[in-house]
Design a protein with these regions (language model features):
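Active-site pre-Tyr helix/loop in NAD(P)-dependent dehydrogenases
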Residues: 1-3, 9, 41-44, 81, ...
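C-terminal substrate-binding subdomain of Rossmann-fold SDR/epimerase-dehydratase oxidoreductases
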Residues: 61-191
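Catalytic helix-loop patch of NAD(P)-dependent Rossmann-fold dehydrogenases
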Residues: 1-40, 49-60
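Short acidic, glycine/proline-rich loop/turn micro-motifs
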Residues: 46-50, 89-90
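A short alpha-helix capping/helix-coil boundary motif
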Residues: 1, 43-46, 140-143, 147
Length: 191
């Protein structure tokens, strides 16, 4: 329904995989195929036992932020502060991994032959600085950061048009950005 374009090899790979599915007659007629387009999955299981532990230097905001909290890195690098956003930093749609799991369950219960594509996100965007402030507020921790030049390939704003999944699968995210920040921090402290 929306034109797809990639800003990176990773993004192009995702598009190529979708195109391979769409071009195979088996997926169109003989089975129920659901493509879930994730936006920015973050957070951790609420018991703090399962979460993300990146290898090497993370490229995503939350793992890098947690690396700063855990003294792996001296400060958080904020790439770009001159975007046309609420505070000049990039905006993304962050979805709690537990909400993502719920979306998978809803999709598995969809029993329709053919291919369905759903955007899985909250439909709301938060800037890098809004995430930092939410993390600081909910966890009572100050995050040292420095503004850096923009990264090549980063887009200004990206969030899900999630109307289709809301309507068709009756799915909606339940956890807000504060819960995401709390659960991610809890996991990082246990691991």
């Amino acid at each position: 329904e929306h034109p797809l374009s990639a800003m990176s090899p990773y993004g192009q790979n995702k598009i190529d995989i979708e195109q391979a599915i769409f071009s195979d007659p088996f997926f169109k007629t003989d089975c129920c195929t659901t493509v879930l387009r994730y936006f920015n999955p973050v957070g951790a299981f609420q018991d703090g036992l399962i979460g993300e532990i990146p290898r090497g230097i993370p490229n995503n905001l939350m793992p890098y932020l947690l690396g700063v909290v855990n003294k792996v890195y001296p400060f958080l690098q904020v790439f770009g502060h001159d975007y046309k956003t609420v505070d000049g930093t990039p905006v993304r749609d962050y979805i709690h991994i537990m909400d993502l799991i719920d979306a998978h369950y809803q999709a598995l219960n969809e029993n329709k032959t053919g291919i369905e594509v759903f955007n899985v996100g909250t439909g709301e965007g938060y800037s890098v600085m809004q995430i930092i402030k939410a993390f600081e507020q909910v966890n009572k921790i100050k995050i040292p950061f420095k503004y850096m030049p923009r990264r090549e390939g980063d887009v200004e704003t990206c969030f899900a048009d999630n109307k289709k999944i809301l309507k068709r699968l009756n799915w909606k995210s339940k956890r807000d950005i504060y819960q995401i920040c709390f659960d991610a921090f809890k996991f990082s402290q246990k691991n």
